[in-house]
Amino acid sequence: MSKNIYCVFLRKQAEGQDFQSYPGELGKHIFNNISKEAWAKWQQKQTMLINENKLNLISNTDRNFLEKEMIKFLFKS
């Protein structure tokens, strides 16, 4: 059973994620502050970015671009 958290993206209490979806300290921050609903919205946006920009996730440059976009989307919206 998931815990409720204050989601900084939705700006309200919401169901937290079941597990840490992203590695490292950033992943811990996302797990503690981003709800399941907000993470699902990011996954949709991420898919659009990958397709529209023809990103190659093997490329460090493309992965770094995607990570910056994720931070902007989740924490600066």
UniProtKB/Swiss-Prot annotation:
The keyword Manganese does not apply. InterPro entries: Fe_traffick_prot_YggX, Fe_traffick_prot_YggX_sf. Gene3D superfamilies: Fe(II) trafficking protein YggX. GO terms for biological process: cellular response to oxidative stress. It comes from the Bacteria. One of its GO terms (cellular component) is cytosol. Keywords: Iron. One of its GO terms (molecular function) is iron ion binding. Transmembrane segments: none annotated. The keyword Iron applies. Belongs to the Fe(2+)-trafficking protein family. Could be a mediator in iron transactions between iron acquisition and iron-requiring processes, such as synthesis and/or repair of Fe-S clusters in biosynthetic enzymes. This is Probable Fe(2+)-trafficking protein. It comes from Baumannia cicadellinicola subsp. Homalodisca coagulata. The lineage of its organism: Bacteria, Pseudomonadati, Pseudomonadota, Gammaproteobacteria, Candidatus Palibaumannia.
